[in-house]
Swiss-Prot record:
It comes from Oryza sativa subsp. japonica (Rice). Residues 1-24 form the signal peptide. This is Glutelin type-B 2. The keyword Signal applies. GO terms for molecular function: nutrient reservoir activity. SUPFAM superfamilies: RmlC-like cupins (SSF51182). Residues 50-245, 311-460 form the Cupin type-1 domain. Keywords: Disulfide bond, Seed storage protein, Signal, Storage protein. The keyword Protease does not apply. Belongs to the 11S seed storage protein (globulins) family. Residues 464-495 are annotated as: Disordered.
Amino acid sequence: MATTIFSRFSIYFCAMLLCQGSMAQLFNPSTNPWHSPRQGSFRECRFDRLQAFEPLRKVRSEAGVTEYFDEKNELFQCTGTFVIRRVIQPQGLLVPRYSNTPGLVYIIQGRGSMGLTFPGCPATYQQQFQQFSSQGQSQSQKFRDEHQKIHQFRQGDVVALPAGVAHWFYNDGDASVVAIYVYDINNSANQLEPRQKEFLLAGNNNRVQQVYGSSIEQHSSQNIFNGFGTELLSEALGINTVAAKRLQSQNDQRGEIVHVKNGLQLLKPTLTQQQEQAQAQYQEVQYSEQQQTSSRWNGLEENFCTIKARVNIENPSRADSYNPRAGRISSVNSQKFPILNLIQMSATRVNLYQNAILSPFWNVNAHSLVYMIQGQSRVQVVSNFGKTVFDGVLRPGQLLIIPQHYAVLKKAEREGCQYIAIKTNANAFVSHLAGKNSVFRALPVDVVANAYRISREQARSIKNNRGEEHGAFTPRFQQQYYPGFSNESESETSE
């Protein structure tokens, strides 16, 4: 008897140690940002010609449309990314599904409710229902619904979708929800082939899809219950065969986004925007304090089941960098948004004012997928050979892939611009070429002077002309004279 108890205790203790170790590894923000768990590309890639992408094909459903970017293009395959844009109409429900790859969603427009179902987590939301007869009289039958947490999303939110975790979205607003989804195919969480696969838990994709500028094709995809035998499925779930066939959605032609006639009846707490912001700040402080004491890790329930799945990146008051004459920059990484340790992705939102310039930079530890939300921006990207691989204007609805280490320079057009950049590292960071904390500011004057064959005065001008500006620059240096430089300065040598 004692031996049996000891054996059980040993097994339980070992399981707890494994859980503690895995949780600490997944959620520990001190993970080396220079290291990435991505598998990398399995092919020789050439990033010598970049292009601005628009959706290539779309699949319509009853209450919305899903638009796919060209996943077969070399740039998507080499960066290991998959991108879709989805529109959900009012009272539209994106049916539950899960994916083999983690992803980030940015809500461009609209608001609604969403759910992530983490395995093993308790149903913390409980709701009582009373059935009524057709005459409105209460019947004796009552039932209770229990489910996991429901999250409210709105414009400007970044939503994390871990691989293998079922999720759903519902539009409870008056306008369509428009969202851009970026999936990381090369993430180590994906042990299947390097392709994005969605496993539908309901509905199907037996819809006609249109390829932009080309033909119309038939697209077919059933939910996972369709592959099980009806008898075996009914026995496993304890239901009759009629109900099992409904789960298989064999004759359901609504697609993956379905219309909810009278709206979803959901139990959800309501918070004002101020309350939500205060709660988010409190959670950040609480999370930061937890990291100071590793012994506070308490396994599955403390982390997965209570972790925040969305954060708003559009709020001006939470900008990381702000220039009142140029614009603002806001970022989310695993330090601010712990679930990104599971996703291994991060995001940066940039709002540039009229003719403002973003300090030239390169992404140190990630690829960057830039989606233009509003306005236009002139963009130039340079390769390791010093050649321009992209020089054009990025317009609303277009996507530009910027490979890791490629230098980039952006300038807003007259109407300004707003864009979201999704990056393939949970703690992505950049190296700026100009302004405060830039490469030039970090170099000694003599190094700059001798490297470019210029005087020390000219080197100091290069280092300091942008003063204390960081990130977004004002356009005030257009057509202006730079101290220490003249038209003949190219022939000058260092002192």
